[in-house]
Amino acid sequence: MSHRAYEDTALPIGFNQTLSQPYIVARMTELLLRDGRPEKVLEIGSGSGYQTSLLAQLVDQVYAVERIKPLLDKSRKILRQLKYRNVMFQHGDGSLERHSYAPFNAILCAAAPVSIPEVFLQQLMPDGRLILPVGKDSQVLKMITRKDDEFVSETFETVRFVPLCEGTVR
């Protein structure tokens, strides 16, 4: 697969999951940083750890949740070898569970729910932002910003992500 390393395309990482294309990783990171550097970020669907490693260089603390344990174990090992100290990993279902370190300045979700899960919104600090793909067959990239008790939604480009699934895989 190394011969595809410079392609702007999603790549398979096993378990019917993909590493997002580099453009989308950069775009989601750009949106995350648009209004300043968030201190505390929840990443749902950390997969290979690629986006996690980028976030770890840009924010104070990353909480990475992955539902597929072998992917989580592999990314944890790699990021520890690279001496990232500001990432906490958790094996779990980020689509249903409120994270124990909530609330967050930002949440980045790397899988597409059909609609925005309420549990995501509940975990945002005031002025916090949620960046995620939304939709079943046709998906769009969205950013939802919490303004007091209201949520302001912005829609960006059409995207294609794996679906957000419930449950965990050991």
For each predicted feature, which ranges?
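Substrate-binding/catalytic lobe of Class I Rossmann-like enzymes that use SAM or dcSAM, i.e.
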Residues: K142-D148, V152-R170
